Amino acid sequence: MPPTLAAAPLSAVDLRTTLFLSGPPGTLDIAVAGDGTNRLYLATQVGVIRVAEGGQLRAEPFLDLRDRVGSTADEQGLLSLVFAPNYAQRRTFYVYYTDLAGDTVLARYRASADGQRGDPASAQVVLTIDPPYPNHNGGKLLFGADGYLYLSTGD
């Protein structure tokens, strides 16, 4: 039986916002690794992935891709990151960015055994897209319940 969707009137929903972290400028995506650490990984448009733990940003980045990320104008730069469903065992994660040539790149990386740092030398390009325009490069990576990796693209 398919799931049933229901809507509640907005007046019945109690929503509140609380600032729990003042992240770095240009944060485009936030991900969790699903490894039980409760760390937040913040992807910044310039190509740096920062880690927040307990409401505090770590001084050292998780991964710095500024030497690979091209323009950070419009919908370009480091667009998204996602951790593999088996990240706790394999330490594999994916990033989606525009490179120095203007192409959109999906790349796989590995983290250190303790999960504290991403290894820039572990990069494996999975997909390169030559976009027809320099903007609307897309921007979201997700793993579905089926275990497949999904990415959105622009034009």
Question: What do these predicted regions represent?
Answer:
Residues 1-155:
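Acidic, Gly/Ser/Thr-rich repeat motifs that build Ca2+-stabilized beta-propeller blades
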